[in-house]
Structure formats: C-alpha cells, structure tokens
C-alpha cells in the first residue's frame, strides 16, 4: 500500500511541474497575437456605436490581421491592438478596470 501511495504522490508532483512550466507559454501566446496598430488612435477609431469598429476593419485591411481590439486607457486614451490569432468580432473591447 505504501508503494501505491508513493507512486500517487510522484504522479501528482509530475503533473504540477508540467502545469507550472506550461503557464509562461500561455502568457507569451497573447503577446504574439496582439500587435499595436499605432499609438493613440482616438475615440473615433474605437467608437462603441460603430460595429465592427474601425480598428477591427483597419487591422484586417491594412495589417492582414484577423481583427482588432480596442484598449481603453486612463484619460480617454485609446489603443488599437490587431489580433492575429482570433477573429471574434463580438469581443472588440479591452478594459483596464
């Protein structure tokens, strides 16, 4: 029975190590997917009433991306991030709050 318990503990330890080493790869994947379109693009580029946003359309047209997401910062600053991995048009806004 003690042999089975030691084997179970070893298996759990190996699984935890694999999970811990996998986490940085997931974070790096996001940075590879989202590339900035170019500086503070302003409110009109990401106006919520326009669907899909100009950011989304221009990222597809100008950069060859699958789409674009708007990142709203403090003081009304807006950045457009071109998304090269996902083409979900329903999730176009990222909030820092």
Curated annotation (Swiss-Prot):
GO cellular component: extracellular region; secretory vesicle
SMART domains (UniProt xref): Knot1
Keyword Thylakoid appears in the UniProt entry: no
GO biological process, alphabetically ordered: defense response to fungus; killing of cells of another organism
Keyword presence, NADP: no
Annotated consequence of substituting residue 6 to V: In strain: cv. Cvi-1, cv. Fe-1a, cv. Nd-1 and cv. Wei-0
Subcellular location: Secreted
Keywords: Antimicrobial, Disulfide bond, Fungicide, Plant defense, Secreted, Signal
Phenotype when changing residue 3 to T: In strain: cv. Cvi-1, cv. Fe-1a, cv. Nd-1 and cv. Wei-0
Residue pairs linked by disulfide bridges in the UniProt entry: 33-85, 46-70, 55-80, 59-82
Record site feature (Reactive bond), residues: 49-50
Effect of residue 87 to K: In strain: cv. Cvi-1, cv. Fe-1a, cv. Nd-1 and cv. Wei-0
Recorded GO MF terms: sodium channel inhibitor activity
Signal peptide: 1-28
Alphabetical list of InterPro entries matching this protein: Scorpion_toxin-like, Scorpion_toxin-like_sf, Scorpion_toxinL/defensin
Protein family according to the UniProt entry: Belongs to the DEFL family. Protease inhibitor I18 (RTI/MTI-2) subfamily.
Stated name of the protein: Defensin-like protein 196
């Amino acid at each position: 029975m003690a042999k089975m318990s030691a084997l179970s503990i070893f298996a759990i330890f190996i699984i935890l190590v694999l999970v811990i080493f996998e986490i940085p790869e997931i974070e790096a994947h996001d940075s590879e997917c989202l590339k900035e379109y170019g500086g503070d693009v302003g409110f009109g580029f990401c106006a919520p009433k326009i669907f899909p946003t100009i950011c989304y359309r221009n990222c597809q047209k100008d950069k060859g991306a699958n789409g674009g997401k708007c990142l709203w910062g403090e003081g009304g600053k807006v950045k457009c991030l071109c998304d090269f991995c996902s083409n979900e048009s329903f999730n176009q806004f990222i909030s820092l709050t």
